[in-house]
């Protein structure tokens, strides 16, 4: 039995990047041998075990053979006779197909170290085409490592185009698609994810609602520069499509409510935010009402950040002041300072109370502009 560290931990260590967990491959072992050493089996489709102390994942060396559509259509063969080189060959990219022995020796049969130095994302073998999820993974890696200078190898991009044209991506389940999108939104340069998907034709399949125009990509880039919050970044991505399209997209991909709610709101109300500095007090308060700012101030702040990213997402305007956000923050603060208890005492009739509260809040906002 031989154990090797594999995958992202090896790659990131070679790049000088921090990494949290390590994955391991075990060569020459059986399920029985792993269980005898107190490893806990967790893999349903292939033998994966948790280390009894570290809880890191240890997988038996295996090969995979395509047996159906999508990313789940594989027959897995795991046995003591599967070599390390065979296991590494089934992996997606050369930079992810490097193993490290317990003595620190690197096993690199597919020249991953050379591609790390060249900053190239290159597929290991033609078997890459058997898993359509890899199209999204490569786009995500391109986004994650773009600031290090990584690009997709031309032959890999061509293979991704062929996979897209063959209809392979249509077999992906919504949850996995969203997981890759979400992970891409959490990278430093999420706009690169969209650019790569567009380049291979996958964007029209995965996110047909998105228009990958320069402004959309710049707004997403500005959102990423302004905040690590993936909800804001998602809203920046969808801000210029119709509200109906956002609903359709979020339902299709089963996107969490916090993303769909902010995206929908930004689509409907971002133009009101942009013109806030020209609004009278009653119109400013209407913006607060339409965005439910009084009840959900935290989400309103995300709305303002998205609108600011949109405003900065144009050539020459990246660093321009955006006073509209500050004005609306001040308007919200003023509206929240209104003493509701006093108004309740003054208006015993419930039918007059709500209008009185509304007018008091408008007056408080008007005082800001006086």
Predicted feature descriptions by range:
Residues 1-370:
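Catalytic cores of the polymerase beta-like nucleotidyltransferase superfamily
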